[in-house]
Curated annotation (Swiss-Prot):
Residues 78-94 have a biased composition (Basic and acidic residues). Belongs to the UPF0390 family. It comes from the Eukaryota. Residues 1-94 are annotated as: Disordered. Residues 1-24, 41-57 have a biased composition (Low complexity). Residues 25-40 have a biased composition (Basic residues). Pfam families: DUF2462. The lineage of its organism: Eukaryota, Fungi, Dikarya, Basidiomycota, Ustilaginomycotina. This is UPF0390 protein UM03986. It comes from Mycosarcoma maydis.
Length: 94
């Protein structure tokens, strides 16, 4: 054949968008790991994780104690006081 002749390329079979592989949505599973060569970042992440865990545990225990007492289950004091005042006003009206 002549120079520069290029045979026709084989066409790919037409695929519908549904048959293609689906990209996973959402974050990846598992904990995020910081490279061990960054000691300061690793240490900061550890302390942040400990603080978060302790704060969460304290809030959960506080909510359990409030639930057992039968009081309002709000974390913010002003909102709890406002709810208690509203309940007292409603009881006085009846």
């Amino acid at each position: 054949m002549a120079q520069g002749f290029k045979p026709a390329k084989a066409k790919k079979a037409a695929t519908s968008p549904k048959s293609g592989s689906k990209a996973k949505s959402g974050p990846k599973r598992g904990p995020r790991v910081i490279a061990p060569k960054k000691k300061a970042a690793v240490q900061a992440a550890k302390t942040k994780q400990k603080q978060t865990a302790s704060i969460t545990a304290r809030i959960e225990q506080e909510m359990v104690s409030r639930a057992s007492k039968g009081g309002p289950l709000t974390i913010m004091k002003k909102a709890a006081d406002g709810d208690a005042d509203d309940k007292k006003k409603n009881q006085n009206k009846k």
